[in-house]
Amino acid sequence: GEAQLEKTLELAGLRRGEHYDAQVTIKDERGDRHLPDFVIRLPEGKNLIIDSKVSLVDYERAVTAETDAERATALEAHARAVKNHIDALSAKDYANLPGMESPDFVLMFMPVEPAYIEVMRSQRELFNHGYQKNVVLVSHTTLMPILRTVANLWMIEHSNREAREISERAGD
């Protein structure tokens, strides 16, 4: 999931080290270490956290199931795995770590689009469950507009900085 997410970040026009970092170690007030998958930098010192570690083992079992009953059982397990990951991610409280200046939510990236679609189709309440826990489920398709918005914010920030510099030089 992490490699696919990084490709998605790059496709959106974001650059590692400038617009985002991977596997950043952050310590909380107690000194405990946290390791979000990706921290997306936003203008004005803000950050957005994306996690990409959701298990797709049960979804793969559903895809290869030989009977409808096996498929249904595997899809139920897939939905439980996604819900459990939402709950675990929410408990990490990444958005409130010191220095994060993050919105009060984390994006949970599901790298396999059909796995995302299936869980959204069969467990409609799961998105709301995540939202209430400050975890927003995203796939490549739903994440891309968010990342393009971030890239556009950086272009505007860069243009504004250049305009200020030109204005300051003109005033000298």
Which stretches of residues belong to each language-model region?
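Amphipathic, heptad-repeat alpha-helical coiled-coil/stalk segments that mediate oligomerization
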Residues: G1-D172
